[in-house]
A protein has these predicted regions:
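Extramembranous, membrane-proximal N-terminal regions and early juxtamembrane loops
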Residues: 1-236
Length: 236
């Protein structure tokens, strides 16, 4: 009943439009906006378990699955901002989420995410194996070698990410938006959101590892400080 009432202020008008946007697709009974939000929450939840070495393969698979879900929804329906425009004209329901280019970008994102996950697991596994060394000097030398190898892995991964983002931007520019006045906005918003979300797990995993390795060459006080800093980064 409240939705049928005429809004008295601009604030109520915006609230009314926002509410309609969240429920724009009543025919399928799906709320893609909240589906996207839930996938983001699942990613945040998975970050905690992924950095736990004792979490097991099931939780690590959950980490990958949440990313695949997130980027598939993002590629098919772009960002949640797009939903704020669709309700304006339900007659133009020919939304191009079935475009082969968008589906292809979703598949590419999943493939790259699989590479990312494997890279992170191998890097963390290589660093973790050092704890079985018998002397501290051997552990330090081995960790330096492993860290150098890990940097090479991440350099390759950054190049792959750059190629992916260029391809993703190309697909978006080739995409004929239903609403021409929002096409540029959708491209910019989707590109920034996609890029930030893709590089965030690298930061959250690489930074703590570097801090842990750096703490080996410091005294006990600095070592504790660096280790706590790495834990804080993981929590963030």
């Amino acid at each position: 009943e409240s939705l049928e009432m005429k809004p008295d202020t601009d604030y109520e008008l915006n609230l009314l439009e926002y509410t309609k946007a969240l429920k724009w697709d009543k025919r399928t009974g799906c709320d893609y906006y909240w589906a996207l939000m839930r996938s983001k929450q699942l990613i945040i939840f998975s970050f905690c378990s992924f950095n736990d070495y004792n979490s097991g393969i099931i939780k690590k698979f959950l980490f990958f699955l949440s990313f695949a879900l997130h980027y598939t929804i993002n590629a098919l329906f772009f960002t949640e901002s797009n939903l704020h425009q669709i309700y304006e004209d339900e007659g133009k329901y020919n939304f191009s989420y079935q475009s082969p280019k968008i589906l292809l970008s979703a598949l590419i994102s999943i493939v790259i995410l699989r590479i990312m996950l494997q890279t992170l697991i191998l890097a963390d596994k290589d660093i973790l194996e050092v704890k079985y060394q018998q002397t501290k000097n051997e552990a330090i030398d081995l960790k330096r070698k492993k860290l150098k190898c890990m940097k090479i892995k991440f350099a390759i991964f950054f190049i792959l990410n750059f190629i992916l983002l260029v391809l993703f931007w190309y697909y978006l520019t080739c995409f004929n938006a239903v609403y021409e006045n929002t096409q540029v906005y959708l491209i910019e918003n989707s590109f920034v959101s996609f890029g930030f979300s893709l590089f965030y797990p690298i930061i959250i995993n690489l930074a703590p590892t570097i801090l842990r390795v750096s703490s080996l060459n410091s005294d006990n006080k600095n070592q504790i400080c660096l280790y706590k800093t790495s834990q804080i980064i993981q929590l963030i």
